[in-house]
Amino acid sequence: EVLKMKKVSIIYWSNGGNVEIIANAICEGASIGDVEVETKHVADASIEDVLEADAVAFGSPAMINDDIEEIDMKPFINNLRELDIKNKPLVLFGSCGWRDTKFIDKWEKKMEDYGFNILGKLTVRDSVEKENIIEAKELGRLLTQA
């Protein structure tokens, strides 16, 4: 029997800032052993990237009204509502600058409602600290074990 490689999809919106740094750190943490990791900006991602993955991570900065980025990320996420998610393991990450971290809690609740199994979440403020990177790598590892 051929063991299928585990697949992890990391999908995020970032304008080259903190969210991208965290996405890359999660990717690094997940890139161990026989794991195929794909990191994509949401503009290049498809629903298949979520469906075909064994575990996923989504990232977005906090925008107005404690919401995720609404031109690309929000419609992408909303499209997942109709899918049979079957408790797929998920990590959420984002940056909130001066805003509070309510947006990620709100997002987590929505993803639970969609059927995801939330393994963890990570928010960074103005700049990415060393401990954020360590935590992000750890979340990446978690995704491979789920």
Task: Map each language-model feature to its residues.
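Aromatic-flanked redox-active Cys/Sec active sites in thiol-based oxidoreductases
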Residues: 12-16
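Short, Lys/Arg-enriched N-terminal segments with co-localized hydrophobic residues
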Residues: 1-4
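FMN-binding flavodoxin-like domain, especially the glycine-rich phosphate-binding loop
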Residues: 6-8, 18-21, 25-45, 49-146
